[in-house]
Amino acid sequence: MDPKAPKKSRQGKKSKARTQEKFARKFPYRFSWLTETSSEPLRPWVLTKMSSLLREQLPLQKTLLPTRSIPVRGLGAPDFPPPSCLQPPPSPPRNLWELALLTRRFPRLAAPPPTPRSPALHHQSLGHSAPRRS
């Protein structure tokens, strides 16, 4: 430690401890660093006595049973077909002519129409058959 450092007065430490105790009494939560450790268990709040008195005045509902969040199949739960969102997406077209037909039938708004790469694909997309070579 530095011998030239200013020493805290004992009165300052006491006032800090007093302020913390006052805060702990007003604040509804317990802080482990504000309470001294002791072997005696923590006492419940005074409000629990009042709430237990109120609880005794309430009528008992003995017929209540815990419910399941997911109902048992067949017991009150209607049988719905699985939603379409759970079905796997359709497989992509395997042939080039399928792709050409789909893009003509369902054109994309943002993208320009696809340009054919080969003359055979161009003839197929127009409805003509490709020229046969013998």
Swiss-Prot record:
Q: Where in the cell is it found?
A: Cytoplasm
Show the InterPro entries listed in the entry.
Answer: C3orf22
**Keyword set includes Ribonucleoprotein:** no
Tell me the keywords, alphabetical order. Cytoplasm
The answer on whether this UniProt entry bears the keyword Ligase reads no
Q: Residue ranges under compositional bias (Basic residues)?
A: 1-17
Kindly list the GO CC terms recorded for this protein: cytoplasm
Q: Which portions of the sequence form the region Disordered?
A: 1-21, 108-134
Major subcellular location class: cytoplasm
Know the name of this protein? Uncharacterized protein C3orf22 homolog
Task: Read off the lineage from the record.
Answer: Eukaryota, Metazoa, Chordata, Craniata, Vertebrata
